[in-house]
């Protein structure tokens, strides 16, 4: 009828993508969203398709594609209302979820474990939190960063323990110092200090040993429970 809006092919692709995502058919959704991006790059749904591609790739366990899509969106649309989402997903997709960092090795040098993805994710989520302190995704990003921070620290100290076990004290000191200097709020700080204490004692570094013991004692005192208030 006159005045009735005719549905355009672009919208057909977009609606198809929504149906496919709603049914967890992310392969199909990616196909539909990429069709919009390729066939209608300046159309009504082009920008929305690009941002939803980030999500679809991520949910399809294609973390590299999700990261690339996020970077592309940031580059093309730096002032888009959903730009915070792109930064958030960029950081989230850097971390490969199926990686097991804590497998016990018997004869393997565990200092060779690759945690570059985790470090990149931590850095990118930190950038997101700095840029968008009021974003709706802030709370999740903070929780993820706490998890990543502790994971990175645990991995560094697993390597430090390995170095200590083979009397490679300088390597152990380097790893423990990395945790103290770069991940100061992790749950592993006390353990890092104890590794330094053991290494300094083994090397006969009396002044450094005294310094680190002072810090350890101060942490112990901080963690002591306080007496109850008088009523």
Which residue ranges define each predicted feature?
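Short coil/linker segments at helix-helix boundaries
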Residues: 62-68, 94-124, 163, 167
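Single conserved hydrophobic/aromatic residue that forms the stacking wall/gate
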Residues: 221-231
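Post-signal-peptide N-terminal segment of Sec-exported extracytoplasmic proteins
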Residues: 5-60
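Short solvent-exposed coil/turn linkers within tandem alpha-helical repeat scaffolds
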Residues: 39-46, 75-85, 99-100, 115-116, ...
């Amino acid at each position: 009828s006159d005045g009735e809006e005719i549905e355009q092919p672009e919208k057909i692709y977009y609606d198809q993508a929504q149906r496919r995502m709603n049914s967890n058919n992310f392969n199909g959704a990616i196909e539909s969203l990429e069709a919009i991006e390729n066939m209608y790059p300046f159309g009504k749904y082009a920008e929305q398709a690009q941002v939803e591609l980030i999500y679809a790739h991520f949910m399809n366990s294609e973390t590299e594609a999700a990261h690339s899509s996020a970077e592309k969106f940031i580059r093309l649309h730096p002032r888009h209302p959903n730009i915070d989402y792109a930064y958030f997903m960029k950081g989230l997709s850097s971390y490969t979820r199926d990686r097991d960092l804590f497998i016990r090795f018997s004869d393997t040098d565990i200092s060779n474990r690759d945690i570059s993805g985790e470090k990149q994710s931590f850095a990118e989520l930190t950038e997101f939190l700095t840029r968008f302190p009021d974003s709706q995704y802030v709370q999740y990003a903070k929780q993820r960063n706490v998890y990543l921070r502790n994971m990175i620290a645990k991995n560094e100290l697993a390597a430090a323990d390995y170095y200590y076990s083979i009397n490679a004290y300088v390597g152990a000191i380097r790893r423990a110092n990395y945790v103290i200097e770069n991940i100061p709020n992790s749950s592993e700080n006390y353990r890092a200090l104890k590794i330094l204490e053991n290494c300094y004692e083994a090397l006969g570094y009396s002044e450094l040993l005294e310094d680190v013991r002072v810090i350890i004692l101060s942490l112990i005192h901080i963690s002591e429970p306080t007496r109850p208030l008088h009523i």
